[in-house]
Amino acid sequence: CCYRCRVENTGNEQLAKLNFDNEYCLFSRRYRREEDAPCGNDPMLMFFTSGTTGYPKIATHSYKYPLGHYITAKYWHCVSKDGLHLTISDTGWGKALWGKLYGQWLCEGAVFVYNFDRFDASDILPMFAKYHITTFCAPPTMYRMMIKEDLGKYDLSSIRHATTAGEALNPEVFRQFYNATGLELMEGFGQTEMTLGIANLTGMT
């Protein structure tokens, strides 16, 4: 297929149309790295902490930071090349990056994104069968809301592995989700200032 980019010029009525394939052919296949290109320990991104002990503080991460989430995706989320991963996290949270993008892409996993203003279990639950989502991560509160919606009404057979983080996991939520799906919720703990710190990884009980 042919990708097109439409650029609007606010000054006049003209619209520029670019053919992606044609533009791509104009670039060299050899990547030339500039000497002053950012890498290694150079700052890559800054998160703000939640500010539980005062004002939010900046947590700066280097270009090495995404590599730490290979473990997150491979051994906690268990993403795979043939799978589709869904992490529910607002993009304002660090979990959106380390739960949706860095490790998941490093593991060659596809990422499912669903935009909503307010979480509604009855909207999310049909997505698993419709799009064949294979790995899933959400906070325990969302699992509770899904259980209240009655998991038995939905086909969740595509899910191979389920994880949770963000707050303490209630044993009753664990039990009810297990009874409905046969899957054990694998819990993890991370912080804005670091990667996934403590978790039930693959092979652990």
Where are these regions (language model features)?
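Conserved S/T- and glycine-rich ATP-binding loop of Class I adenylate-forming
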Residues: 43, 49-52, 85, 128, ...
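Conserved structural elements of the adenylate-forming
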Residues: 27-31, 59-80, 94-95, 143-148, ...
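Gly/Ser/Thr-rich phosphate-binding loop
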Residues: 106, 133-138, 147-205
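Short beta-strand->loop structural element characteristic of the AMP-binding/adenylate-forming
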Residues: 1, 57-60, 87, 110-117, ...
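Conserved pre-ATP/AMP-binding loop-to-beta segment of ANL
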Residues: 6, 16-48, 55, 78-84
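Short hydrophobic "strand-cap" motifs at the C-terminus of beta-strands
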Residues: 46, 88-89, 114, 139, ...
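Conserved AMP-binding/adenylation subdomain of ANL enzymes
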Residues: 67-84, 91-134, 149
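Short beta-strand elements of ligand-binding domains
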Residues: 2-11, 17, 164
